[in-house]
A protein has these predicted regions:
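Glycine-rich adenosine-cofactor-binding loop
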Residues: 2-21, 31, 278-282
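A mid-sequence, solvent-exposed acidic-amphipathic segment
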Residues: 285-328
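NAD(P)-binding Rossmann-fold cofactor-contacting core
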Residues: 24-42
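Phosphate-bearing ligand-interacting subdomains
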Residues: 36-112
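Short, charged, surface-exposed secondary-structure boundary motifs
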Residues: 38-44, 94-100, 290, 310-317, ...
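Short, polar loop motifs at secondary-structure junctions
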Residues: 32-38, 67-69, 207, 283-286, ...
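Electropositive, gly/pro-rich neighborhoods at or near active sites that engage anionic ligands
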Residues: 101-295, 407
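C-terminal functional extensions of proteins
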Residues: 341-408
Length: 408
């Protein structure tokens, strides 16, 4: 009799799982995925379902085909699925689970897990010279600390654009989860990255030297990131005569081992908009500041709502919508790579614009004491499993703040 299983995930890693399964012994009833756009479609000829519906289905095991599986385990447990039914494929300790012997070709599982570990070690050794504080002769870009960056924003009123890993991938022609790549987008991002302006600064990732301040998982991620999107490529994009500021100002909590200073950063941000009229330009369902006190000290708040995904395709309309508003307002942007370019263009037009990215979600995680990226109720959380919220809620005050919807 065959064992009925569900495979969680429809990415490249799921192909490794399929390859390692003894198909004579198992039946794949369905794939599950948090991307709601995939629900009801076929993957490898098999139905893709919403993970919420798994509790209604008959199966023996859910095989998690995701390397960073811990949050998925919590998600499934939260749905009421029993722990003994949850099998993270990339958990090395899985080899001790005797009841799975008939399901997998163990040598393939061991090979996959072994290769992942070896790759991490090789990349760590490759990056080690740049992480060593004793080696000074290697060039690394000048990136100011979070405190210095926040002081600039509070004391001088400059505008800021931020570059994360997603923006660099887009420059390299690689799309990211919520934004397709394009030649125009890449060229505009490169323009902002090299720009020099008195009323605008640029934040980049502080990952070119020591990584010890970040969580272990993030250290591994950035080593691999610098390997895949190599240093030489990134250095070629930067202006070596330019001082860069810290893009992590909007991520002061979840990424760091020492989280005790995050509160100071959030308080500094509140000083940026204290007593001001603000205009928030955000994605649909982002709901910046709703349900918390992040903007309780502003004088007034208006919003322009834009698409959560592929917002750059509506760039001209979004820019035009902002330019119709009063230049005396502080413009807060939470729109991925579109915000990076928008802050630069608005600064040239005389607006005060701040790319605040994930600050609201980070603040929510800080308030709840989260230790990993988790979905936040009623807010689009693209980096957390189950975070592609598309629910409808009634929020009269929020709706009254909306002055325009663009591209929706």
């Amino acid at each position: 009799m065959k064992t009925d299983i569900i495979i969680f995930g429809t990415g490249k890693s799921s192909e490794l799982v399929l390859d390692a399964l003894k198909m004579d012994n198992v039946t794949v009833n369905a794939f599950a995925d948090n991307n709601f756009n995939k629900h009801g479609t076929l993957y490898k000829g098999i139905n893709v379902v919403n993970p919420v519906d798994l509790i209604k289905m008959e199966f023996s095991f859910v095989i998690i085909a995701i390397i960073k599986y811990h949050s998925v385990v919590k998600q499934l447990l939260g749905y009421g699925i029993k722990e003994e039914k949850i099998v993270p494929y990339f958990d090395i300790d899985i080899i001790d689970n005797n009841k799975l012997t008939d399901m997998f070709f163990w040598e393939r599982m061991l090979r996959d897990n072994y290769n992942i570990k070896i790759k991490k070690i090789e990349i760590k050794l490759e990056n080690l010279p740049y992480e060593s504080v004793s080696i000074r002769e290697l060039y690394t870009p000048e990136v100011k600390g979070i405190t210095e960056t926040m002081d600039m924003l509070v004391d001088t009123g400059v505008s800021i654009s931020r570059f994360g890993d997603g923006e660099m991938k887009l420059i390299a022609g690689k799309g990211i989860g919520f934004q397709k790549a394009s030649g125009e987008l890449a060229e505009r991002l490169k323009e902002v990255l090299k720009s020099q302006s008195e009323n605008h600064i640029t934040g980049i990732l502080d990952v070119f030297g020591s990584l010890t301040k970040y969580t272990d998982g993030l250290q591994d991620y950035f080593r691999e990131y610098l390997h895949d999107y190599n240093r030489e490529f990134q250095y070629g994009l930067l202006n070596i005569n330019k001082t860069y500021y810290n893009a992590f100002i909007t991520r002061p909590y979840i990424s760091y081992k020492d989280k005790q200073h995050a509160g100071e950063v959030f308080e500094s941000f509140k000083k940026v908009w204290d007593g001001k009229n603000i205009l928030i330009v955000e994605g649909d369902r982002t709901r910046l500041g709703r349900g918390n006190d992040l903007f309780n000290n502003v004088k007034s708040c208006k919003r322009i709502i834009c698409p959560n995904e592929n917002a750059f395709e509506k760039y001209g309309q979004i820019l035009g919508a902002v330019k119709k508003q009063d230049k005396g307002m502080l413009v807060l942007l939470a729109l991925g790579p579109t915000a990076t370019i928008l802050a630069y263009d608005l600064a040239k037009e005389g607006f005060h614009a701040v790319d605040i990215g994930h600050i609201d979600i980070e603040y929510e995680w800080y308030l709840m004491g989260a230790t990993e990226k988790i979905a936040v109720k009623n807010k689009y959380t693209n980096e957390a499993y189950g975070g592609n919220s598309h629910d409808s809620i009634e929020d009269k005050e929020y709706e009254e703040q909306v002055v325009e919807r663009v591209g929706l």
